[in-house]
Each structure stands twice: as C-alpha cells, then as structure tokens.
Amino acid sequence: MDIIKQIKIYPPANDGISRILVIYEVEDVLPEEDNGHYLSIDLGLHNLMTCYDNVGKTFIIGREYLSLSYFYNKEIARVQSQWGRIQAAREMEDLKTSKHLQKLYRKKNDCIKDYIHKMTRYITNYCVKNEIHTVVIGDIKGIRKERNLGRKTNQKLHGLPYARIYMQLEYKLKMKGICLIRQEESYSSQCPPQSEEVSHIYAEKRNRKKRGIYIVDTVIYNADAVGAYNILRKYHAVSGKKIDMPVTGLSSTKTIKVAV
C-alpha cells in the first residue's frame, strides 16, 4: 500500500484554480526478466501510436488526438480574432489575453494531458495482462528538424506531445517492472517486412501507395503496423536477441478508442 508522505495545498493563482500536490512513497519494483514477449510502438501523425505484439497482433491507439487538437486550435483562433477586434475598437494600448482565451488554453492542455494518460494506461494494462516484459518504442529524436514534410505537416509534427508520451509511458511501465527501450527508427516505414534488414538498401518508398497503405506484391499491409514491426526488427538486430516475429496482424489492425 502506498504511504502518503506530504500534502501541499496551493491557493488560487491568477487563473483562479487551487492546486493540491500529494507526495507518496511507493515500493521499488524489480524489472521483470526478458521472456521473449515484446510490444513495439510506432509514433505517428494521424495514428499517434501503432503497436505490434510479437504474437502476431496489432492495434492503433490515439487516432482522436488530431481532431481534439484541431477543435481547440480552431476555437482559440476564433476567440483571439474576436478579442483582437474588441481591443482595436477600444483603442487599448495595454493588450491583454482575455479570461475566455486563458480558460480555453487551460482546457486544451488538461484535455490533452488526460488523453495521453488514458492512452499510456491502456498500453500498460495491455502489457500486464499479456505478460509483456519489454516495450520497444521508436525514437523520433530529431525527426522534426531533419525532415521537410511540407509546411502543414511540419506544423502538426511540432504540436505533437511526443516527449510527454515517452515520460508518461516510461513511469507507468516502470511501476509494473516493464522495461521501455527507445529504438532508432530510420527506414522503418519504408522497408518491406520480409526484407533481409531494415536499412536504406531495402527501402521501397513506392510500396507506400497512399497514406496508411503499404503494398508488397499483392499483399496489403497497414503502413504504420509495418513501421512498428520494423522497429522491433531493428531492436532485434542491435540486441542480438532471438525474437519470434510473425507478420500476421499487419494487414488487420484493430483500432482502440479512448474516451475524450
């Protein structure tokens, strides 16, 4: 049982909200031994997290994130425009942010934090239920600087909360004794699952016929599922561990909906 060590109560700040900080002690959890059961995760734009379970299952979680973010961004832009016209009409020299706008920013941030918490909790519970002791996640460090994917796509990438996902997932898994490993993921979305290795030598951009689809000969795969699969292949190559990796499930990916 967790032992509460300290409770701090902060009075309302400028936003009018009181905050309570609870500090509690938890027992150290020893890392589970590698049992050959893995989950790999490909972080994306439209599908925030695509997961491959090496028993031959795949699922997508986080598809609602972009629409959630778009809704608040659109509403914030609308209120900003209205407030700008009001300040101009009143000839206000000391420009301030409206309380309505502050409330919208706060609500957006809280909503996204809650959504990421629910996603990472689902993945943690999935690993515990299925006795997965190692999670391998694609390391997208530098991707937003190195790639020019167009103005709109780059704009969306810069707004994605990848650092928060890493942090939330890492601490939740650690509390269950599950290891989280970041794996460099270059060419993971371009190489066929049957290629000898995941590298520029076997990269086939033309196999991605359109967004979400990856075709090898006559077989149609989910492109993000292929990415998650290849991330685990890259980990297999650098770790030297023997990992069973059936391609079943790459064509039929289940979508997990998270309450917003």
Please place each PLM-identified region on the residue numbering.
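Positively charged, helix-rich recognition surfaces that bind polyanionic ligands
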Residues: 14-260
